[in-house]
Amino acid sequence: GSIFAFSQPYSGEKLSRGLIGIPTEDGMYFSWRMTLEDAAGLQFDLYRSSGGGAEVKLNKEPIDRTSDFLDRTVDYTVDNRWTLKATTGEVTTWTRLKGEERNPYLSVPVCKPEDGEIAGESFTYTANDCSVGDLDGDGEYEIILKWSPSNSKRPPQRGFTGNTYLDAYKMDGTRLWRIDLGPNVRSGAATTNFLVFDFDGDGCAEICCKTGDGTVDGLGHRIGDAQADWRTWDKKSPTYGKIVNGPEYLTVFEGRTGKELDSKEYIPTRYPLDGWGGVGGNCGNDNTGGRSDRFTAGVAFLDGKTPSPVMVRGWYGRTVVA
């Protein structure tokens, strides 16, 4: 079977209003989503209950021309609860407790991976790329975060890297799962491009990315040969610390759990290593993975209805799309 058998005609995300409140110098600023399903003439009212008291409507006229509102009379010294009511009967709430810092952003706690050491070099982790998607079908976005080690490398650079991790978080910081891409996926900005999209149309987004032997899914299961190590350990080799041999996989993970749903051979392959030269970049070439290990990815509706992962290898000279 094909990994693309997961793809089904796309019916759109079924998201909640996504009501959010951010403190500003002028008051508490609220915004929310409008959806494609909203009927013409839909109106909203915003209410606030302060200190456990009765709800008070904040807007004088129905809100129907925008999807935001500024509460200029909020008292931050007491607990506040706002309720957004639509004329359809839909109700959404937002709560802010007294004493909370008035930061103009929403802070989401995350779980940093432990520091590590490889080939005598210590490394730590920093938060890197992230994406969002409704992983569990509750109508709320979750955050998918890539953790990058401090010894990440550009493709031409020799040397080892720590593993790359993908985490999934609820907006309150609850971690749903962690995927360890393992030792056979080199860490670097040019390597891991992960896609977050509801490919199979079940209302929950999946994660799709390049993996290797020893990748650990969100349930702790290993992909491919768990004992394989395809890194070059010969210090005299021009590919020292790189991965220029061994299988590469394209894997789809379940959004709810991070479980591997399916893995297939990654296309396009890296071979021939010296087949990626051309006029792009510095017009040079190499056979050490400098050009063959540069990736991008995206989602395309190739037939106008069904989402498909699109994987790209090679930035300069030769580029292959699959």
Regions found by a protein language model. Name each.
Residues 25-26, 173:
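N-terminal prosegments of processed precursors
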Residues 19-21:
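A structural signal for short hydrophobic beta-strand segments in well-ordered beta-sheet cores
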Residues 35-49:
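Solvent-exposed loop/turn segments flanking beta-strands in beta-repeat/beta-sandwich domains
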Residues 5-9:
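Boundary at the C-terminal end of the N-terminal hydrophobic targeting segment
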Residues 17, 26-30:
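Structural beta-strand segments of beta-rich domains
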Residues 23-24, 45-53, 83:
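Short beta-strand segments and strand-loop junctions that repeat across beta-rich extracellular domains
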Residues 1-2:
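Bacterial N-terminal signal peptides
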